[in-house]
């Protein structure tokens, strides 16, 4: 019967499948995996990767470079791998706890590690991130829309499964930070394009342009339990997370170095609960105590607990390097380390000042996971930063944030073993410029990593042309006013660690305080939100708006996740209130919250900012540190600063106590050491010296060259002033003509004179005679010697009059006299007549005259009386030129014949002209 035949065929088919199943599990091929209800079955392929190295990883030694061949969808992929030698800092430690709660800290048991970065051979813009500790785990990005996950099969020594990354399921979740997520496309193209620009190995020369984060990872007790109480498995997962995060941030020119790892094997060391806010602040408080024992830049907690709501991570904004807030918490929501790594990278991004991506920022589609800084994450995981993140990071660094990121770990004891030619300076090496075929350093022998003959150094910003630069040479400039410059010591080729002024140090002329290397003001924050021209609103706006305790006016969220009302004392630490003429804030998904307050009949406008979130986020979820809040570290009053939504006294920074030991001649840096002003010597700035600190290196010694130059300049100016004073006093002596012979008077005349006519200072100015017309005799002089002169106190004596053609009056004098332009025209004359010898003895002091021709009188400083000399009178000459006339009555003295004035040497004329020209 047809029915029985159908049943028989079904049974035979089922039997065949049962017989075939073991073979399918042992041979390469596609199989199905369980999937969520309503989704198609997910497939993975069973493979056995093939190593092409002298020794296979996992047998005691992991090679520095390796070639791995895997099959994926019928295609062989050749992976070129290189060990991530910068993943672990030299000071890396591991800490666990005994049952009694005592910490047990150890260093690495082996110099070998098993974490790699690489590419797919012959595939442009590809990227590989793997670990080979126990089997092969990691991510293989082939092209823009094709990437694979590879992981070992449980209880198998060689088999692995490989599947497309979109088949990795992650629970949906979001960050507590208030923002909305974008959608776009081609995430892998952007990600691999960014990673391609980075060198395959990070060379010593590149360290100076890199930012370096010393990361401390902590797994709480719930995470330890989630890994079946296996301490080694928990540590391996955290190491994998760090390896992925390092790969993500390399595209931003940032390296992540794991400086410490801690597993809470016997209970939590801080309060960890389902509340992400209380967990965050409890962990940050615990971290402050850790800093005294273990130096690091940033700490992240990985918890096995599930946070309430949809929050999977939380972190403060713009807090990188902060003693109080540089850290975050992330929930372990995936069995695969890459899912958790995306969340950790997201929270570190908030510490870097990155907000959630707005629309059109991310070029990765939601179907491919979107971008790392999206507000919500889920299926699949994000892997790339957006271009908006780059801009926000640059802006954060330019404002002085991330000061600790230049403090790169000493690479002389890198975790991973020593090898000449790996590009890292290690113990026993004088230099390392990479392989011989790629070394371009003229100071280093690539074959044996030694310095060439005569070379003192080969690497570092304090090494120039193979020589150490002089002590005091600046090697790192001061970025902003809260930063401090660093100087070479003359003993090391490397620039000292980057230091900045201690938190709580006044800046902006006392209008703000330094915090985390930044000088934060309300004005600057308003301009960041609204653009140029924005300014903070009146204090009344802060008090009225933030007293509401709602979405639009609050002092952040409390430990229960609810908005807090601001007390009048804390009002200026809540939502920032600004005044701006702009229609809306600069943030693409932000809206303006406008409030109008009436005070004594005056309308006051207050403008706040609210970042719009999607409907799924608006319901109860959000971060207390949204962009519309006043930033931590902003001055809210005298000796008060905003901290955690409260206006607190700055005494907890201990700045005043530290500053006292600097004796008023320096400031404290973030290492609590004095940075002395020039002229004072560290460590306490109480003795003369060049300045600087024990941390930042010495300031350059004062050079004697500028001092000598200054002394000579002062002496020259003094000599000029004395000469001018002498000439001035001589020119104001009344009725004392010189008794020197005529030739000597030529030699001792003043080489130049400053005009008192208020002219333009030109070398040959037109003089403004301050004497009424008809009161002065004006004679002409050779053109090369016509210079300004001081007016004498009285008319010239008779012996200075000569019979010669009259000189024209200056144009402005002719205009004042009402004469015609022709009357003031210049009359060229080649030579003037010699003056008659004096009829009486001359005074002993020489008269200081500008010109060596004494036929022209000196104009007086003030107007002469109507009849300056009794018995004389004046009358106009033809052509409008006024000449002083002798008395009309009485006998006239005989006049000697006119004798030509000898022509002066040419060099004298040039010298006079040069001196006066220098006064223009």
Curated annotation (Swiss-Prot):
UniProt keyword annotations, A-Z: Cleavage on pair of basic residues, Disulfide bond, EGF-like domain, Glycoprotein, Hydrolase, Membrane, Metal-binding, Metalloprotease, Protease, SH3-binding, Signal, Transmembrane, Transmembrane helix, Zinc, Zymogen
GO MF entries: metal ion binding; metalloendopeptidase activity; SH3 domain binding
Secretion signal span: 1-26
Propeptide: 27-204
Membrane topology of the entry: Single-pass type I membrane protein
Record-linked InterPro entries: ADAM_Cys-rich, Disintegrin_CS, Disintegrin_dom, Disintegrin_dom_sf, EGF-like_dom, MetalloPept_cat_dom_sf, Peptidase_M12B, Peptidase_M12B_N
EC number in record: 3.4.24.-
Placement of sequence motif Cysteine switch: 131-138
Cofactor(s) it depends on: Zn(2+)
UniProt remark on domains: The conserved cysteine present in the cysteine-switch motif binds the catalytic zinc ion, thus inhibiting the enzyme. The dissociation of the cysteine from the zinc ion upon the activation-peptide release activates the enzyme.
Protein name (record): Disintegrin and metalloproteinase domain-containing protein 19
Organism of origin: Mus musculus (Mouse)
